[in-house]
C-alpha cells in the first residue's frame, strides 16, 4: 500500500502535549517510559499507524476492548474525529480517568462502558453493534477473537496488532475463526517511523453472526481456547 500521509502520524500539538502530560502524570501512567517523545512514538503513533489500512468512510462505530489508559481508542478518535467510539474496561478507576481525559480534550461521541469483555459481548446493547473493534490486549489471536468478534457487526472488522508470530497465531486460530464467524483478510507489516517497533496488523472480517453461546466465561476462554 502507499505510504500513510503525514496527518496520520501527527496530532495537533496542544492536544498531543495535553494527552501526553495527562497520561505520564496520572495513576494510569505509562510505566515503561516517562519520556514524552518515547511515549508519543510507542503509544500514540503506534496506535494510529493502523488508520491508513482500515478503509474508514466516516462516522463508523468503533469499540476498544480492554482500553486501559485509552489505547488505542483515544488516539484513534483524535486522529479521526468522525469515529463514534466506545471504550470498554473492567476497572472503574480507568474509566473515571478516561472520563476526565476525554472531557479535557473535548472529545465528543465517546461512550465509556464498565464491563468485562465476556459480559459485554453478551450484552444486546453492545453485541454485534460495531463496525470496527480494536484491542491492544496481549492475548493469543484465538482468545482475542472470542473476546472481540461478538461486538462486531457482520461486514465489520477486527483490527489486531500482533507481533512477529502473527502467521503462526492465525494458523492456530482457524477453529476460532470458523466458530465466531471471522475471516482473516489481510496481514500487514507496520513499522513505526524512527523506532525499532514492528507489528503485524491482522484484519479480520466478520462474515457470519457469532453463535449466542460465545463469548464464554473468562476462565474457559483462556484455559481452553477455541
For the regions a protein language model found, what residue spans apply to each?
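Short, small-residue-biased leader/transition segments that mark boundaries at the very start
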Residues: 4, 13-19, 23-29
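Class I SAM-dependent transferase core
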Residues: 26-58, 100-110
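Conserved SAM-binding loop of SAM-dependent methyltransferases across substrates and taxa
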Residues: 69-81
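Conserved class I S-adenosyl-L-methionine
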Residues: 58-66
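Conserved SAM-binding motif I beta-strand of class I
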Residues: 84-89
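S-adenosylmethionine
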Residues: 90-226
Amino acid at each position: 500500500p502507499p505510504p500513510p500521509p503525514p496527518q496520520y502520524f501527527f496530532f495537533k500539538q496542544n492536544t498531543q502535549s495535553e494527552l501526553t502530560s495527562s497520561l505520564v502524570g496520572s495513576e494510569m501512567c505509562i510505566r515503561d517510559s516517562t519520556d514524552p517523545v518515547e511515549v508519543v512514538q510507542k503509544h500514540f503513533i503506534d496506535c494510529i499507524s493502523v488508520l491508513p489500512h482500515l478503509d474508514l468512510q466516516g462516522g463508523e462505530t468503533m469499540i476498544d476492548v480492554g482500553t486501559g489508559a485509552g489505547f488505542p481508542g483515544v488516539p484513534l478518535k483524535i486522529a479521526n474525529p468522525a469515529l463514534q467510539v466506545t471504550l470498554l474496561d473492567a476497572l472503574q478507576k480507568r474509566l473515571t480517568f478516561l472520563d476526565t481525559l476525554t472531557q479535557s480534550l473535548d472529545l465528543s461521541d465517546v461512550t465509556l462502558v464498565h464491563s468485562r469483555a465476556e459480559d459485554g459481548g453478551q450484552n444486546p446493547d453492545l453485541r454485534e453493534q460495531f463496525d470496527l473493534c480494536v484491542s491492544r490486549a496481549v492475548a493469543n489471536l484465538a482468545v482475542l477473537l472470542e473476546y472481540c468478534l461478538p461486538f462486531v457487526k457482520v461486514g465489520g472488522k477486527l483490527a489486531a496488532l500482533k507481533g512477529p508470530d502473527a502467521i503462526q497465531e492465525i494458523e492456530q486460530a482457524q477453529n476460532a475463526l470458523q466458530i465466531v464467524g471471522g475471516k482473516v483478510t489481510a496481514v500487514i507489516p507496520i513499522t513505526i517511523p524512527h523506532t525499532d517497533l514492528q507489528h503485524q496488523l491482522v484484519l479480520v472480517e466478520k462474515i457470519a453472526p457469532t453463535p449466542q453461546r460465545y463469548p464464554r466465561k473468562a476462565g474457559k476462554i483462556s484455559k481452553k481456547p477455541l
